[in-house]
Amino acid sequence: LHSFPTRRSSDLMMKAAIEGLEAGKTGDKRPLCIAVTCLTSLDQEVLDNELLINDTLENVVLKWATNAKEAGLDGVVCSPLESKVIHDNLGMEFITVTPGIRLADDSVNDQKRVTTPAMARELTSSYIVVGRTITGSADPYATYKKVYQDFQG
């Protein structure tokens, strides 16, 4: 388990978050700080019709990730589907934390951009976030082990 302070992608807030973490660090390294891009419950239709953003989801996520990197953050929360394009453009050291992870036979519920743990690995996710797949399982520990093994390869 990892704990990352997160901020919604706004340049001034992101820079302030880094400054605060630097000023308050108690050891040699400050905690990692990541920003949130587009939630995995959003898709292109929501972007176009509800948020009125006239661009592709991939371009929006990459732009927000670029803003986060330029502000000095360590990474972003994004769909596994955008992880590879982020790493291709911003480098593998830039962290992608990817929710929306489901096993192949799971319901996607309200999520629109989901992948399996193995696909998240192939798409270069740095870390995965798994919720309902484990918490809704009849055997959460066995499900956790399966997810872990699938992600590790």
Language-model regions, residue ranges each:
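Internal active-site segments that recognize and position negatively charged phosphoryl groups
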Residues: 59-86
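Generic hydrophobic/aromatic pocket-lining and core-packing "Φ" positions
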Residues: 14, 65, 83, 117-118
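Short, small-residue-biased leader/transition segments that mark boundaries at the very start
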Residues: 2-9
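Non-catalytic structural scaffold of enzyme domains
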Residues: 10-35, 45-46, 53, 65, ...
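C-terminal helical cap(s) of enzyme catalytic domains, especially alpha/beta-barrels
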Residues: 14-20, 121, 134-153
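Active-site-adjacent loop and "lid" segments of alpha/beta metabolic enzymes
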Residues: 32-61, 85-127, 139
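Conserved, mostly hydrophobic/aromatic
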Residues: 68, 86, 120, 131, ...
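Conserved beta-strand positions in the central sheet of alpha/beta enzyme cores
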Residues: 77, 128-129
